[in-house]
Curated annotation (Swiss-Prot):
This is Large ribosomal subunit protein bL21. This protein binds to 23S rRNA in the presence of protein L20. Belongs to the bacterial ribosomal protein bL21 family. The gene is rplU. The keyword Ribosomal protein applies. GO terms for cellular component: cytoplasm; ribonucleoprotein complex; ribosome. Part of the 50S ribosomal subunit. Contacts protein L20. The lineage of its organism: Bacteria, Pseudomonadati, Pseudomonadota, Betaproteobacteria, Nitrosomonadales. GO terms for biological process: translation. HAMAP family: Ribosomal_bL21. Keywords: Ribonucleoprotein, Ribosomal protein, RNA-binding, rRNA-binding. Pfam families: Ribosomal_L21p (PF00829).
């Protein structure tokens, strides 16, 4: 059984036991959360899709940790003009583990 959920402006395909890093959620480490923006649930041959969301479906998860991704470098340059600009960015994330899918 798997589901497609939407959180933080992105869509994720999840199964029970999966760990994934999503955009920062304002919750404590170790707490349980309910993700109710479920787009699709598949159980074997039975596939349920929403338009765009499924009303009764929920995905439950446990917050494992909060952290920051690796730094990415942004480098802008204009040729022949001696214009060079370098910038770094680290995005915050929340790591969750999927504990249940209810349709």
């Amino acid at each position: 059984m798997y589901a497609v959920i939407k959180t933080g402006g992105k869509q994720y395909r999840v199964q029970i036991g999966n760990k994934l890093k999503v955009e920062t959620l304002p919750v404590e480490v170790g707490s349980d959360i309910q993700l109710d923006q479920v787009l699709m649930v598949a159980d074997g041959e039975i596939v349920s899709t929403g338009a765009p969301l499924l009303d009764q479906a929920k995905v439950s998860a446990t917050v494992i940790s909060h952290g920051r991704h690796d730094k990415i470098r942004i480098f802008k340059m204009r040729r022949r003009k001696h214009y060079r600009k370098q910038q770094g960015h680290r995005q915050n994330y929340t790591e969750i583990q999927i504990t249940g899918i209810s349709a």
